[in-house]
Amino acid sequence: MHTGCCTTKFDTEVLIIGNGPAGIALSSFLSGMHPFYDATHPHENVTVHEKLLANHDFSLIDQDLSWSSNLTELSQSGRPLSVLYDMLVRPGADMGSDAPGCIQWELNRRREIPHMVIGETKIGGSWNEYDAEMLTVSFSDWMDMPGFTMEQWLGGRPLVKRLPSVAIATYLKKYVERLRLRKKFHQYFVVNSIKKIGDVWVTSGKRSTDGRSFVIRSKQVVVACGKTSPRKLQLPNEEHCSSNIVYDVRALKERLDATKKTVIDEDENYDTPSTSTCSPVIVVGDGVSSVDCVRHCLERDIPVVHVIRRTLRELRNVMLSRLSPIHYSEYTDIYRMMIGRSVHKNYQRVLDASITSVSKIHVEITTGSNREIIEMPYSTVAVCIGRESHFSTVFENAHTFLDYQSEQDETLFAVGAYAGDHFVRFLVGGCLRVAQHITGAANNNNVTAKLLPIC
């Protein structure tokens, strides 16, 4: 890379910031991995089949797929191409069908567009940070990257639908190696600034491994980093009590292990007391992450007070309510407790509630229409109210994105969670759309033309 004040060429044509599933999928598309409609496996939707059959000699990247926004079953999501891609690679997936996909993959290195992928972590992004034993919410085949599936990597269909997060992190690394993308990926790059100077994006920051600065110049930038920063309670005393507050199940496990009391009995006749007599863990939130924390505590006989912002009526419509007890029994069991359908000696819920004050020994929970205040002692507070991205602060100007492209600058894009696609099964379609934008621009311009220096 060039770090001087003046250079005769850019570091790369396209800079992808984020080395998780979104960055990996987009890198694959830009490296020449292209999807073609497989006419031998026609899709059951007649309109989709006829539209794609008419251009089946062209990859989806080279086709105008704007017609997809006119199909009701695709447009309702607001991301028609994401849904179209998903229904082509996994037809009938939501109905439990194992029908073969309608896509053939071809790797054409001559179509490669020069690009770099940088990330703050190891390849795989936030999948490296999750609790290794945590099972994915998505089924294993919903995690497939373009052209090399989870099933191909495993050497056969897995015996279970959901795999632990460590398997997903490993698959993503192996995928990058299998497609020979490794040289494009640069780990532990922390971005501090992104500026547009003329027609050039200048991205700068430091490497977390050695503190060395970097500067990358590119014609286009794609923000592919997820929402990695946990949302906090935003209470005045929260930072002062940070040693007692965690934001995911992995950190909760580590804290409980660190504070666990060991009873030493020389005569070996002393029964270890149940941990249910200690102050409870207070879990805040009503999503999957909060349920992971509740479940871990109950499995260890630790009392839990579950603080839920929603009312009972609202709680009946959350994502957890739609999970199948066949495949997600660990979540549906806790969900039944959340809505009062079942009870557990160590579980207490507080609905229509929020934590309004925290000290090192107790919290204040405000609940109900009359805003009753409950003072509750605690051992640990697990705050699981979602994640957010602070990445927008690195830009000089604010950007809004439509169809994955900045409305303020057509050379800036966003994919993955940053663009609102939170599940891998849908974010790959978003990457396909950005690949269309970038490939179309490359076809309309001389990519190899000499570029002016930045001074």
From Swiss-Prot:
Belongs to the OKL38 family. The keyword Ribonucleoprotein does not apply. InterPro entries: FAD/NAD-bd_sf, OKL38_fam. Its EC number is 1.14.13.-. Transmembrane segments: none annotated. Monooxygenase catalytic activity. Involved in regulation of cytokinesis; promotes rho-1/RhoA activity, probably acting locally at the midbody in late cytokinesis. Monooxygenase activity is required to stabilize structures between primordial germ cells (PGCs), termed intercellular bridges. Dispensable for fertility. The gene is osgn-1. Its cofactor is NADPH. Changing S126N: No measurable monooxygenase activity. Intercellular bridges between primordial germ cells (PGC) are unstable in a proportion of embryos and eventually regress, prior to the start of epidermal morphogenesis. Disulfide bonds: none annotated. Capable of rescuing defects caused by knockout of a human homolog, OSGIN1, in HeLa cells; rescues the activity of a RhoA reporter, membrane stability in late cytokinesis and cell ploidy. It is found in: Midbody. Disruption phenotype: RNAi-mediated knockdown causes abnormal binucleation of primordial germ cells (PGCs). No monooxygenase catalytic activity in the absence of NADPH. This is Oxidative stress induced growth inhibitor homolog osgn-1. Changing A99T: No measurable monooxygenase activity. Intercellular bridges between primordial germ cells (PGC) are unstable in a proportion of embryos and eventually regress, prior to the start of epidermal morphogenesis. Its main location: other. Keywords: FAD, Flavoprotein, Monooxygenase, NADP, Oxidoreductase.
